[in-house]
Regions:
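Helix-start (N-cap) segments at beta->loop->alpha junctions
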Residues: 161-164, 181-186, 197-208, 236-237, ...
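Extracytoplasmic/periplasmic ligand-binding sensor regions of membrane-associated signaling proteins
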Residues: 105, 110, 123-199
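Solvent-exposed, extracytoplasmic
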Residues: 97-105, 130, 194-237
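Amphipathic coiled-coil signal-relay and dimerization helices
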Residues: 118-129, 227-233, 270-272
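Extreme N-terminal signal-anchor transmembrane helix of membrane signaling/transducer proteins, especially
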Residues: 1-46, 50
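Extracellular/periplasmic juxtamembrane segments that couple receptor/chemosensory ectodomains to their
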Residues: 226, 234-295
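Juxtamembrane membrane-water interface segments immediately C-terminal to a transmembrane helix
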Residues: 42-75, 94
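Extracellular/periplasmic ligand-binding regions of membrane signal-transduction receptors
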Residues: 66-98, 114-131
Length: 295
């Protein structure tokens, strides 16, 4: 009887050891599986973010190339007007209307008007216009002040409604102004002037619309170097106060991809600076794993 009791006791201890070993192995296995799962999750998310970042960079590079090509053409129009027309004219005895009309007609799909002013804001010539609006002081407008204040540079404004000239059809034109200081000649004497090329905003809008796929979680927008929005697919909602963008902070960021927490959600933000303008094209991708973020 004593031997049976000892045998049962030893067997019980053996079973307890086996159970302990099994539990230990189970815990270790679960821990290893958990660690493996976490590692794979991070690898997956990192890879996913790397792919999104790479795609965003490629999209912005292409968009920037298209935009820079368009803006380069606008600068070429300004250069042609200045070096081939203005510099060849003595305004005391000659006008520039014919040459300005030819230049406008060749580029009218992208232009609203071309105008030249003296340093005190008097209109020298403009095409194609029905007449100058009354009580408009161009010397108070930003594009004019920028051109006079920094004479060596081109200056691109943000979008605005042109208020310089009357329109026979009473239309309002949204434009982006390209201005520069020029040298005018009158009776052989040189004086400062300002050349203004008003670009049709819709041309730039169409370029940016092509970069937006229609997916709510991904979009591309354009702002100037100070963070003022030039184009945004949700622009109307922003103006109505129904949508917010982190554009003022992002304006200070370097080119490349950045992670940010916005509206308590993670976003992948990629920035690309447009040559000659200081403008920034921004790609925004909402990064989350909850249902509805990716389809």
């Amino acid at each position: 009887m004593k031997k049976l009791t000892e045998f049962l006791s030893l067997k019980k201890k053996s079973i307890s050891i086996q159970v302990g070993i099994a539990i230990s192995f189970t815990v270790v296995a679960l821990f290893a599986m958990g660690a493996f799962g976490i590692t794979m999750y991070h690898l997956f998310t990192n890879r996913m973010e790397a792919m999104m970042s790479e795609n965003a960079v490629q999209l912005l590079d292409q968009t920037a190339t298209n935009l820079e090509s368009y803006l380069k053409n606008m600068r070429r129009i300004s250069d042609t007007m200045y070096y081939s027309v203005i510099k060849d004219k003595d305004l005391a005895s000659e006008d520039m209307v014919q040459e300005m009309n030819l230049l406008y007609d060749a580029n009218k799909e992208n232009l609203v008007s071309i105008a030249c002013y003296t340093s005190n804001g008097n209109l020298v010539e403009a095409v194609p216009v029905a007449g100058e609006k009354e009580d408009v002081d161009v010397t108070e407008q930003e594009w004019f002040r920028e051109a006079v204040g920094k004479m060596e540079n081109f200056h691109f404004s943000t979008p605005h409604v042109q208020n310089l000239f009357d329109d026979a059809n009473y239309r309002y034109h949204w434009v982006i102004s390209l201005s520069r200081a020029v040298e005018l000649t009158k009776s052989g004497d040189s004086e400062l002037g300002v050349l203004l090329v008003d670009m049709n905003y819709s041309s730039i809008e169409q370029l940016l619309e092509k970069a937006n796929t229609g997916i709510n979680e991904e979009y591309v927008y354009l702002m100037d170097g100070d963070g003022e929005i030039i184009y945004h697919p949700k622009q109307k909602l922003i103006y109505a106060g129904l949508y917010e963008e982190n554009n003022e902070e992002i304006a200070a960021w370097d080119d490349g991809s950045h992670k940010e927490d916005f509206w308590s959600e993670n976003r992948l933000v990629t920035v690309k600076t447009v040559s000659y303008t200081g403008w920034k094209i921004v790609s925004v991708i909402w990064v989350c794993m909850r249902q509805g973020c990716f389809s």
